[in-house]
């Protein structure tokens, strides 16, 4: 069910752009979560964020981070969640583990599914007015044939779904349950998120591979979006009146080869020039699996990453642009150029290492 909540603007429960709101965020030290925090702080909102360690993202200014009320806790600890959410108006649930490694699978399900259930339950307990869940296009499921995915796509169990996708699908079920129990809010499904961050983690590793002139490419197709666009869409939807809806957040669809070439241009590096076929991928992930078994080192390529690299899926962003008519995505060329410049600056200053 999808609906719009109509509220009188004088209602104190109504969110108004420009008015300070108290927003609680999970995953605030992560790539996407930290940019959401920056967006909220710069718009004048009061932010409280839960974290497991004192380490903060180096790619967000200390001026922004110092304006956040940091609370030690964990999404797997319902007591700390309940305490941290007291007095807040809204919740952005961004905490999640993104992994395609067999070794991290159990923890990923634990955090992504049970953690989301805890956040939803705490939000209901604390009578949170608005709830926004950061999901992923992966939660919509991979397609067997080349096609464009919209918000109407129904989840289907098939061999193309990764365990990460399954965990995000099950986490969404807890959010829909929360909506049925009275929470108001939306789910967003970003595609692969690009930007300046820690290139030893998450999708930022794509930039490190390009900088190191990784020579292989595949002919897979996927959706991509800048991290600042994800943050802006998050904040606009958080303070909208839409509820019980999902929105795909995707700027452009392009091949992995095109993406790698654009990033290589940003670093003035060589293009990848060797095609990794499906057969080669099948052999490579098996060799990596054996190496992982015998050495204990995390596999650089898994069965799931090999599968994703060759899939051809595009994502439709029409629903978001209809809902937010003044919203505009930054072109990927601009996103990548800006990110590459910042990565080079971080390397030269010693903030970032290879």
Predicted regions and their residues:
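Conserved Rossmann-fold NAD(P)-dependent oxidoreductase catalytic core, especially the SDR/UDP-sugar
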Residues: 114-163
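N-terminal Rossmann-fold cofactor-binding loop
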Residues: 50-54, 75
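NAD(P)-dependent short-chain dehydrogenase/reductase
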Residues: 182-224
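NAD(P)H-binding glycine-rich loop region in Rossmannoid oxidoreductase-like domains
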Residues: 64, 68-114, 122
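Substrate-positioning beta->alpha
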Residues: 118, 170, 201-202, 218-239, ...
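Active-site Tyr-X1-5-Lys
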Residues: 160-186
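N-terminal Rossmann NAD(P)H-binding glycine-rich loop of SDR-like oxidoreductase domains
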Residues: 22-43
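Mid/C-terminal beta-alpha module of Rossmann-like enzyme folds, strongest
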Residues: 233-300, 322, 331-332, 337-354
């Amino acid at each position: 069910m999808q609906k719009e909540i109509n509220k009188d603007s004088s209602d104190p429960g109504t969110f108004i752009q420009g008015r300070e709101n108290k927003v609680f965020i999970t995953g605030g030290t992560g790539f996407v979560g930290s940019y959401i925090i920056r967006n909220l702080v710069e718009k004048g909102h009061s932010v409280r964020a839960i974290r497991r360690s004192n380490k903060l993202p180096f790619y967000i200014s200390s001026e922004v981070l110092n304006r956040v009320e940091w609370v030690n806790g964990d999404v797997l600890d319902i007591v700390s969640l309940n305490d941290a959410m007291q007095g807040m108006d809204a919740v952005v649930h961004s905490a999640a583990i993104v992994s395609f490694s067999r070794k991290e699978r159990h923890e990923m399900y634990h955090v992504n599914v049970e953690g989301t259930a805890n956040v939803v339950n705490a939000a209901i307990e604390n009578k949170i007015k608005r709830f926004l869940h950061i999901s992923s296009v992966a939660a919509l499921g991979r397609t067997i044939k080349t096609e464009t995915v919209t918000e109407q796509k129904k989840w289907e169990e098939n061999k193309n779904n990764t365990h990460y996708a399954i965990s995000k699908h099950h986490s969404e079920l807890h959010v829909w349950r929360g909506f049925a129990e009275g929470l108001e809010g939306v789910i967003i499904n970003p595609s692969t998120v690009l930007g300046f961050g820690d290139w030893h983690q998450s999708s930022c590793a794509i930039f490190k591979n390009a900088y190191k002139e990784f020579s292989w490419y595949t002919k897979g197709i996927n959706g991509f979006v800048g991290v600042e666009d994800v943050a802006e869409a998050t904040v606009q939807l958080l303070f909208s009146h839409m509820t019980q809806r999902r929105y795909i957040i995707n700027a452009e669809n392009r091949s992995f080869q095109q993406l790698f070439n654009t990033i290589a241009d940003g670093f003035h590096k060589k293009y990848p020039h060797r095609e990794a076929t499906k057969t080669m991928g099948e052999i490579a992930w098996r060799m990596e699996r054996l190496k992982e078994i015998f050495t204990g080192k995390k596999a650089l390529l898994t069965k799931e990453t090999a599968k994703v690299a060759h899939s051809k899926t595009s994502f439709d962003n029409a629903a978001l642009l209809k809902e937010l008519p003044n919203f505009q995505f930054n072109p990927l060329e601009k996103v990548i150029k800006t990110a590459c410049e910042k990565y080079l600056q971080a390397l030269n200053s010693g903030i970032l290492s290879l």
